[in-house]
Regions:
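Bacterial N-terminal signal peptides that target proteins for export
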Residues: 1-9
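Bacterial N-terminal signal peptides
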Residues: 8-17
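Bacterial signal peptide processing site
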Residues: 20-21
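Non-globular targeting/processing and membrane-anchoring segments
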Residues: 25-151, 222-225, 231-402
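Short, surface-exposed basic-aromatic patches at helix termini and helix-loop junctions that form
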Residues: 88, 177-188, 210-211, 225
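Short, thiol/selenol-centered motifs that function as redox-active sites or metal-ligating centers
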Residues: 99-111, 117-120, 155-180
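Extended amphipathic alpha-helical interaction segments
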Residues: 139-174, 190, 194-200
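Short aromatic loop motif centered on NTY/YTY
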Residues: 167, 192-234
């Protein structure tokens, strides 16, 4: 009897092992993987389809359905409407520096772009392959994805220190899983994904070619929007400081795509400091429009003869994590701002958020250009600054512990 029991256990183990081998031998395409990670049903014939019966995935799907529905109502739909109203002639390319893997807001502000260039320090990571996860690995993977997105779903930005930890955990790591989720939840269909690197001339190479030390690495994703038109997303992991840009071909890669529309938000005020002047000057020279909050390019860096300024919302100064970044000229400019019905940036509440739309003036219009609201020279006496509160936590609707 004991011998029969041992044989039965051995047979069951072999069956389970065979199933695991069969599962890992299958490969899911990028679009199905993105939908699975986003809590959306993959195609019926996908090898990922059976995994959606896992209670962990079903809970994950319910959580993301709720979280993204709230985000769509609270912010994204309003940003899309704002953009369509105020960006009259969008360029084919949009640039989003210091973005992290934030395709979500790149798409909301610039849904009509055909090429997206996102750049930040965070590594791309390998192409996600859920089928290679060990048995029992689905739950931890989905927790990792949710935890990685917690701050941007709440505040509209990634918390850099937290992201460094989140993106280096688990079998599926890096920024690609997050880009996948945002593409799927934005209604996009992924057609192809490849890992790339850039040489010092800005030429794109496949990742399987020999990579020089410190070369910018990233990914190229082709996808279709709801209109069926093919679009391209580049995410490049690179150092955007002066020294980093001077030693890489990243800006040479960007130059043929310019001029474009630029987005800067929650950028840690890096463009205010001397070690990021190369990036700042490049954006000013190669952007047709710039949408930013006050953490982007300081107002004093704009040439008032070349730009028109359209302020929206309310400027209350930086949060207390960034002392010394208050701008008197910005405050004067926003005294004549238009209403803003969505929150963005470090002051994520709509009643405290600011958005500045800067539009480059055509050469023929220079000299007779009149700004909607001109920055005032720093002659008035210094006004008292508003209180700079700590960043407060938003409503908690995440199921995972904090």
């Amino acid at each position: 009897m004991q011998r029969l029991a041992k044989i039965a256990v051995l047979a069951a183990s072999l069956v389970l092992a065979g199933c695991e081998i069969a599962r890992t031998a299958e490969v899911a395409n990028a679009n199905d993987t993105a939908r699975f990670l986003a809590g959306m049903q993959p195609s019926a014939d996908s090898p990922l389809a059976p995994l959606t019966q896992d209670p962990a995935w079903q809970r994950h799907a319910q959580f993301f359905d709720s979280a993204f529905a709230q985000l769509e109502q609270r912010q994204l739909s309003r940003i899309v409407a704002w953009s369509q109203l105020h960006l009259a002639a969008p360029r084919p390319t949009m640039f989003y520096m210091f973005s992290g893997p934030d395709f979500l807001y790149a798409d909301a502000f610039h849904s009509r772009a055909s090429t997206y260039v996102l750049a930040a320090l965070e590594p791309t990571g390998p192409i996600p392959d859920v089928m290679k996860l060990p048995a029992g690995g689905i739950g931890p993977l989905l927790y990792y994805v949710e935890h990685s997105l917690s701050s941007i779903l709440s505040f509209s930005f990634f918390i850099t220190k937290q992201m460094k930890v989140d993106l280096d955990a688990g079998e599926v790591s890096g920024t690609l899983p997050i880009l996948y989720v945002f593409l799927a939840r934005s209604g996009k269909t992924i057609r192809d994904v490849s890992l790339i690197w850039l040489d010092d001339k800005g030429t794109v190479h496949a990742a399987n070619e020999p990579v020089p030390p410190n070369a910018p690495r990233g990914t190229r994703i082709t996808f279709a929007a709801s209109d069926g038109a093919e679009r391209t997303l580049y995410y490049v992991s690179t150092d955007l400081s002066n020294s980093g840009l001077r030693s890489s071909g990243f800006l040479k890669f960007c130059e043929p795509l310019a001029p474009g529309d630029s987005l800067i938000k929650s950028a840690s005020y890096l463009l205010h400091v001397g070690s990021f002047t190369v990036m700042r000057d490049w954006l000013l020279a190669n952007s047709s429009t710039i949408i930013q909050d006050d953490s982007g390019i300081p107002l004093a860096s704009y040439d008032r003869r070349k730009w028109r300024f359209f302020p929206f919302g309310r400027y209350e100064g930086p949060i207390d994590k960034f002392p010394g970044r208050y701008q008197e000229r910005y405050a004067e400019l926003f005294e004549r701002s238009q209403p803003l019905d969505f929150g963005i940036g470090y002051r994520w509440r709509s009643s405290e958020s600011n958005v500045l739309l800067s539009v480059r003036v055509a050469p023929d219009d220079m000299g007779q250009m009149e700004s909607t609201a001109e920055p005032v020279p720093p002659s008035p006496p210094r006004r008292s600054r508003p209180r700079l509160p700590d960043m407060l936590e938003p409503p908690r609707y995440f199921w995972f512990p904090r």
